Structures are given as C-alpha cells and as structure tokens.
Amino acid sequence: SSDVCSSDLGILSLWLGIMKIGENSGMINALSRWLSPVFCRLFPEIPQGHPAMGSIFMNLSANMLGLDNAATPMGLKAMKELQELNPKKDTATNPMIMFLVMNTSGLILIPVSIMMYRSQMGAAQPTDIFIPTLITTAISTIVGVTAVSIAQRINLLNKPILILIGCISLFFSGLIYLFTQVSREEMGVYSTLVANIILFTIILLFILWGLWKKINVYDAFIEGAKEGFTTAIRIVPYLVAFLVGIAVFRTSGAMDIIVNGIGYIVGLSGADTEFVGALPTALMKSLSGSGANGLMIDTMKQYGADSFVGRMSCVARGASDTTFYILAVYFGSVGITKTRNAVTCGLIADFSGIIAAIIISYIFFF
C-alpha cells in the first residue's frame, strides 16, 4: 500500500498543478460553458458553467483514452468541486453518483494494456479482443448511466443526449473500421503514440493558455501541487483499509467458493460451463486492477492466450473498471461516508459488463 500511496503522491501533485493552471487561466470555465448543453442533462444539479463540468469532461476523456495517470487526479479535482456544491458534506450527491458510475463502468476506446499482455503471452492475434471489449464496455457504461438516471429520474430521451449518442456511435464505427485496416503491430504502436501525444498536448495546451492569459503559471502549478499532496495524504486511510480487505478476500478462499458455486449451478441447468474459468478475472476487476491483471495472465497461462477462456478473461478485464477502488479513493478524498446508491449502481454496471462479456465472447470466440 505504501508503494501505491507514494506513486499517487507524485501523480496527483503533477496533474492537480496542471489543473490549477487551467482553473486560474479560465480554461476550465470555458470548457464548462461549452459542455453545458449536454452535461446539464446528465448532471442537472450542477449549475451551468460550473468548473466541475470541465473537470468531469477531462477525467472521462482521459479514461476513454486509457490515460489512467491523468484520469485519477482530474477525477479527484472534479470530486472536490462537486463537494463545494454539497449541502451535506458526509453524503454523496446525485452528480457525484452519476460521475462515479461513469468512471466505474470503465468506457475505454483502445485496451492497449490488455493487448500488450496478450502479445506477451504469445497470442496469434493480440488485438482480436478489441471489438468485443469495446462493445462490452459500451454496454456496461450504458447500463450504469441508465441505472443512475432511473434512480435520479433523469430523462435521457432529449435532443442533446441523443446527438451525443449518435456522435459516439459514429466515432466507434470509424475506430473499428480503422482498426481493421492495420496490423496488430501497427495498432499497438499507433495506440501508444496517440496516447502519448494527447498527454503531452494537454499539458502544453494548459501552460500556453495560462501564458496567453498572463497568469503566473509557476505559482498556479505550485498551488495545485500542494493540493495534490494534501489529497494524497487524505486518501491514505481509505486506501489502506481497501487494500487490506482485498488481501483478506483473496487469501480466504472466498473467490474459489463463489466461482465453483456458479459453475455448479450453471452445470445443473445443462448449459456450457467453459466460461467459469474466466470468472475470477471478471470478479476481481471490481476490486483491484493489478489483481485482475494477475488473474488474467494466470488464466492465459493455464488455458492458452488463444483459448476461449483466455480470450474471455481479457474481454472481462476490459468490461469495466475497479469499482470499489474508485469509490474508496474518490469518496475518501472529500470525506464522504454515506454513499447512498453509488455502490449499487456501480455493481449493476459491473454485473452487466460480466454478462455482456460472457455473451459476446461466446458470439465471437466459441
């Protein structure tokens, strides 16, 4: 846990420093005003043009691009801004719950790390899980957002949301088409290159915008970095408790009991039980990203990277994000102890991702 905390300290200090430059220069406010027509439908309790809109957008964009190191600090910045609007400081608000479920559903465009692991394990086509994973994580996100919208009585059938869904669908279609036109080696190189270029561009753009607005960029960065240090210290107790809980769960044998129980029940119905071998990865991903990666690699070692179980474990790993880790860190950063229905909605997204991973894997690989 000390390694995780020390790693988070540097990352949070860097990115909250960059975000403070954007805040002081007015860039976040400008981004918030631009996003208001869409985000005010999903987050109706956030005032139009509030800085939280910009931070939420930056976080979700970083998540979709697989820029985890940038996404978490931006998400914690958004949580701090949402907490400023919170009349009950120990209770999660509706916008917080919607934001966290959008994070836990783990929508990502290109699962670069999963494809890298498949390549290392000797898969003939490491990228063959791309389209199934993209479909699965999209389903998880849609179900999660829908669950929160039903709980909060948000109407999703309005023009801005439908236009956004249409644009995302077109983008996904274009991405899938481009994906089919390049080799797996080129895809890995291009994905990493694009991610690094975007990361560098974001940092450079914030600094240049601050210089253009004639603010003291250095002082703004230092101020934000100090906030990052304070935030990292604040989340340590929550993070340690969470990591201890995961260790107990993994070593107690509870995972084996759950997986074997599911396999037994499915077997009684006469249905195919081959998917059960990938369930440890699917269940662990809600708790720990590194734990899920380890189980995914173990599954590929045991069954083979190109086996049905090996491929499904990869699809399941990319279906959603580490729900309990995200809830612990994000809520812990602002002192939220009453999470309301955040865990329930997050687990609904997780469960839908697991079901989708099973069905889609059977369609593509069985």
Where are these regions (language model features)?
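Membrane-interface helix termini and inter-helical loops of multi-pass transporters
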Residues: S1, S119-A123, T180-Y190, D219-A220, ...
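Short, small-residue-biased leader/transition segments that mark boundaries at the very start
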Residues: V4-S6
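Hydrophobic mid-bilayer segments of alpha-helices in multi-pass membrane transport proteins
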Residues: D8-W15, I163-F171, L193-W209, V236-V244
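Juxtamembrane transmembrane-helix boundary signature
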Residues: S13-P37, G245
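Juxtamembrane interface elements at the cytosolic ends of transmembrane helices
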Residues: M27-L31, I142-A151, F200-F221
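Hydrophobic alpha-helical transmembrane segments of multi-pass integral membrane proteins
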Residues: L35-G75, V240-I258, G263-T299
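C-terminal transmembrane helix pair
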Residues: A71, A78-R118, A123-R153, L279-F366
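Hydrophobic, small-residue-rich membrane helices and short re-entrant helix-turn-helix hairpins
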Residues: K213-A232, T339-R340
